[in-house]
Amino acid sequence: EGVQRFLKITSFLEKADKFHGAVSHFIDGTTGKTVAFFGPKDNGGDLVETSFLFQGLLTARQYFDQENDKEKQIRRSIDSLWKNVEWSWYKQFKDSPYLYWHWSPDQAWVINHKLIGWNETMITYMLAIMGPKYGISPEMYYSGWASQEEYAQEYRADWGRVEDGKMYTNGNTYYGENLKVGVSNGGPLFFIHYSYLGLDPHKFTDKYTNYFENNQKMAKINQRYCIENQGGYVGYGEDCWGLTASDFAWNYQAQEPMPHRDNGTMAPTGALASFPYTPDASMKALRNYYRNHGSFLWGEYGFRDAFNLTVNLSLIHISEP
């Protein structure tokens, strides 16, 4: 059954709209056509979402290793999709030190969003460097993702609203944890989740830090911020923590452990996806969410996307078209 389902997935992806090998953020599940959910400019390739897709496909490929026709076809399909992603196209111009998030077939680089860490896009640079046909130079890891040029510093300082970490490196101590890399005190927890679904942070060390250790510190900082609970929000504590991206009462926001980015909304995925970093603290959150709040937080498909006990609200989904 798993093999048949995966053949259906790869067959669909082969026929879906692609833009220099990259897929769009949202795809119509019936037709494979692009859904410009975020507006008319969002009608082309999304390199970051493409990288999330491919870390999953490449990981799954390792499991389908039998020499039967169906599993061979899965491997061939994934190989073809993978080899035809034109990572280097998304540099925008030949000597660019950065990758760019979007490209539109009729509006080109109108969104013009450079990929600069620290955020969820590390996996994009890693896969682009490994690209078998259209790869980028490994030097772009430091010139793009970990850039320390003035533009990158301004970008980080702007979204973080602090100077901490604007150089990509940080070095400050928060709640007893010395953070080597990251803007502010780490940001929303999906930064330490998304890129590491296919990339093992234990085994990845650059000239600044080991990323399992650095990510673990971010998870601990997030929990301790919630224990301190500067905003006085209902429920926060050692078993209710994990600020990250989610829907909330008024829209969508990437919640993070800073007062100006925290409105009392908690997403179960924050603590639960941090199990590899904080197994004991994550288990406390899991038990609390299920045993004490399961009546409204647990549904047919598991935990709901987010809840806010201060305003008595639970939410079902995130970024659903």
Report the location of each language-model feature.
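Ser/Thr/Asn(+Pro)-rich, low-complexity disordered segments
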Residues: 1-319
